[in-house]
């Protein structure tokens, strides 16, 4: 099998509007399409960074909570590359987004920081 790339990551939101605001206003993604799926009582938004499809947000009635601490099995976190980590962290601070201290990757020497989306999904910003 030859894979080309990761197409997108799907995120189920406990509060669709709050998550949509976070992924657009905090992370700067743009919604290029949004649909209500009546049979599933579910909203779906396709979120892009530039022209690249990255995150698919879903709403479902009463989704069960999923553990998101780093040691849980399954998806650990989402990572986004940034040109200037200090500037990105300043933006998080200006929007009152709590984050961990900036750390340095011992293998690459690059800096990174973790914070969470509204449902506690860990998000990492990693410097280019």
Where are these regions (language model features)?
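N-terminal beta-strand motif that seeds the catalytic metal site of vicinal oxygen chelate
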Residues: 1-17, 75-78
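Vicinal oxygen chelate
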Residues: 1-2, 35, 46, 89-128
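Exposed loop/turn and edge beta-strand positions of beta-sandwich/beta-sheet ligand-binding modules
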Residues: 5, 41-43, 74, 109
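Core segments of cupin and vicinal oxygen chelate
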Residues: 11-54
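Short amphipathic alpha-helices within nucleic acid-binding modules
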Residues: 22, 86-91
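A short, acidic/glycine-rich surface segment
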Residues: 32-34, 40-43, 62-68, 101
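Short, charged/polar surface micro-motifs in flexible loops or helix N-caps
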Residues: 50-54, 62-63, 85
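Mid-chain, well-packed structural core segment of small domains
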Residues: 71, 78-81, 85-86
